[in-house]
């Protein structure tokens, strides 16, 4: 049983972790104007510059794909990523951005799975998210379809879903089904509230965090990331050697 019911631990702060130890930010919203992330090219450049100053060296950007709000496609994301990389060259910012997506768990996602029209991180890890309001009734058939296509299902920020705050058994079921977990670094700064912080700490203590992402949307998140980089639990996660980020 995962230890989320433990008494929430006091957040201990240290000097900022050098993000070069993480290496790769694999969840971000850097492409201008296609979701609720960066809105202008200047925004995109500011986000990349800020993350590089922390030490991140490489990026997988993952725009929302959500049929009701952000109807992005493989082509819009790939083209947007190319535009961003061209801007970085012109701005003499030495880094590379790679195209992925954050798929909302809806009927459109099921259609994309059926067509195998998907952008996975490194061609391997398929990032998806649930609704914050409604627990998915039965995600397991879709998870099995994802695996049958040769992808590894990767759930974005499980610490943020209220229906998991007091039901670690539900996360255990996902884990048993082969789902990887990605933690938002800002959760360790309490950015999403005390319950998300508690679950994030519990996930680290229970060694069930596979990836760390900034999920950055706007420049104000840079200040939050700066605080999160001082978290004792972040040090614990990085020092555990469990993170797959460096291999991306």
Identify the residue ranges that each predicted region occupies:
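Mobile, glycine- and charge-enriched loop segments
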Residues: 2, 13-33, 168-185, 189, ...
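Extended substrate/RNA-proximal surfaces in nucleic-acid metabolism proteins
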Residues: 12-13, 71-181
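Active-site beta-loop-alpha junctions enriched in small/polar residues
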Residues: 29-31, 64-65, 100-104, 131-133, ...
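An N-terminally biased module of ancient metal coordination in phosphate/nucleic-acid-related enzymes
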Residues: 1-92
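Non-catalytic positions within long, well-ordered alpha-helices that form the structural scaffold/packing
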Residues: 52, 147, 204-205
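Short acidic/histidine-rich active-site segments
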Residues: 209-224
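Mid-to-C-terminal alpha-helical segments outside catalytic/metal-binding sites
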Residues: 8, 226-248
């Amino acid at each position: 049983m995962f230890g989320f019911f433990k008494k929430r631990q006091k957040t201990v702060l240290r000097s900022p972790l050098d993000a070069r130890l993480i290496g790769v930010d694999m969840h971000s919203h850097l492409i201008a104007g296609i979701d609720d992330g960066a809105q202008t090219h200047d925004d995109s450049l500011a986000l990349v510059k800020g993350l590089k100053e922390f030490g991140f060296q490489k990026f997988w950007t993952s725009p929302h794909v959500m049929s009701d709000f952000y109807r992005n496609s493989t082509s819009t994301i790939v083209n947007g990523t190319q535009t961003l990389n061209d801007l970085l060259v012109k701005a003499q910012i030495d880094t590379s951005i790679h195209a992925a997506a954050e798929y909302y768990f809806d009927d459109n996602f099921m259609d994309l799975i059926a067509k195998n029209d998907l952008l996975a991180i490194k061609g391997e890890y398929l990032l998806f998210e649930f609704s914050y309001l409604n627990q998915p009734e039965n995600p397991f058939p879709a998870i099995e379809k994802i695996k049958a296509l040769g992808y590894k299902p990767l759930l974005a920020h499980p610490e943020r879903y209220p229906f998991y705050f007091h039901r670690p058994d539900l996360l255990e079921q996902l884990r048993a089904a082969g789902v990887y977990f990605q933690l938002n670094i800002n959760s360790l700064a309490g950015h999403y509230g005390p319950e998300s912080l508690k679950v994030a700490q519990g996930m680290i203590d229970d060694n069930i965090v596979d990836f760390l992402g900034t999920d950055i949307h706007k420049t104000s998140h840079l200040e939050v990331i700066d605080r999160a980089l001082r978290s004792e639990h972040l040090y614990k996660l990085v020092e555990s050697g469990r993170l797959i980020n460096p291999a991306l």
